């Protein structure tokens, strides 16, 4: 009988310890997410950021997982880069299986809604692109989506990934158009 009570108490102690561990993990993850959000917000305010995309959504809803170091949208002051590179057997114009466009960013606007979500919009003008770029970042996260809306055709594309300060970005830029 004493052994039974000891076993029950021991299992309850383990359960409480596990729950504490889960709560601690959740609190640590929330703190990390908040820190990454603040870092992304500062990078956006300074106009020195990169969205490293790990997923691409195409015009009709199909999607593909892609490499985040070759698929990105970046801004450094008034200079913008949009690069997409797919895992295909041919090299494409940028040498990576996609396109890389350098351009000038204009009409840069940042808005924060009542819930703290951030919306960034800008126009990117380059040799191979003239597009509206819209970035949405939900409050408390550095995960974001970017909609690329070309002005000359209807090849709408959406990328999703993480917003990082330019100095922390790990991207490989291909040949520009």
Where on the chain are the PLM-derived regions?
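N-terminal secretory signal peptides
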Residues: 19-91, 157-159, 167-175
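Residues that act as N-cap/strand-start positions at coil-to-secondary-structure junctions
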Residues: 36, 65-69, 102-104, 116, ...
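Mature extracytoplasmic domains of secretory-pathway proteins
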Residues: 73-117
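Sequence-level detector for tyrosine residue identity
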Residues: 10, 57-60, 108, 139
